[in-house]
């Protein structure tokens, strides 16, 4: 599926990038539910600009730094001093590079840094505050766990509270955007088909793309595609719950399973 919409969000990212050309650096936080298109939006925004993307995974800090160093060298060249093994050291190296270079640094799934080293947010804050006024970096911090990202950037007890200069909360596509998309479909689509598309996907970008990219445009096809073995929809509820709720997952899953089996009385659900 080709890139559609997001005009306001692209403009906000463009303004932040242009602003970083002149000190100080800019920090943009991009949030939104899983599958809504955050990474695609950022990729579209940075595709013709100097940039490096770091994908954060739950790994040892040493292994993560080794992988992020490779990504940095591939994107920007050999700008990282040899022997770096800490995330703070790598981030500081890029801030130093940003004193004389204008570029974007994207940290995707940023909340996962807490699983690597819980003290990294404080180190990022310290390095950012010490260097942002003399540098030209557009730092884009993106995450799918809304609860975690909200805590990191909106809890006044957290190190990165108040640091973002731009905040983008990406929403699913509205119905009018889906209409403009399906108008380009190779087959005629009825209002019932459009209603089914919006009802099933909620306008979530990846779900819409799953139908469009596979030529699924009619409601009967959509229903069959959604429940077929291997459908991405079958595990989405569990995956979303696991992403947002770390403690007590089994309890919530048991409650949902009981409801799905028709239980309506509290003693039976519990």
Predicted regions and their residues:
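Phosphate-binding site recognition
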Residues: 1-270
């Amino acid at each position: 599926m080709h890139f559609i919409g997001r005009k306001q969000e692209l403009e906000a990212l463009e303004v932040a990038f242009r602003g970083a050309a002149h000190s100080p650096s800019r920090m943009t936080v991009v949030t939104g539910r899983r599958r809504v298109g955050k990474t695609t939006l950022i990729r579209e925004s940075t595709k013709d600009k100097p940039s490096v993307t770091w994908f954060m995974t739950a790994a040892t800090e040493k292994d993560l730094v080794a992988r992020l160093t490779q990504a940095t060298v591939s994107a920007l060249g050999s700008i990282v001093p040899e022997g770096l093994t800490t995330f703070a050291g790598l981030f500081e190296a890029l801030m130093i590079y940003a004193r004389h270079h204008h570029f974007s640094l994207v940290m995707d799934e940023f909340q996962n840094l807490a699983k690597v080293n819980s003290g990294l947010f404080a180190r990022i804050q310290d390095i950012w505050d010490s260097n942002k006024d003399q540098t030209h970096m557009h730092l884009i911090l993106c995450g799918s766990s809304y609860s975690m990202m909200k805590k990191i950037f909106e809890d006044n007890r957290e190190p990165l509270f108040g640091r973002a200069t731009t905040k983008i909360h990406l929403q699913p596509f509205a119905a009018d955007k889906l209409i403009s998309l399906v108008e380009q479909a190779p087959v005629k689509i009825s209002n019932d088909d459009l209603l089914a598309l919006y009802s099933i996907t909620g306008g979530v970008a990846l779900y819409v793309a799953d139908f469009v990219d596979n030529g699924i445009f009619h409601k009967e096809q959509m229903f069959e595609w959604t429940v077929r073995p291997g459908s991405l929809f079958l595990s989405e509820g569990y995956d979303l719950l696991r992403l947002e709720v770390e403690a007590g997952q089994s309890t919530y899953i048991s409650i949902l399973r009981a409801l799905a089996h028709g239980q309506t009385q509290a003693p039976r659900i519990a």
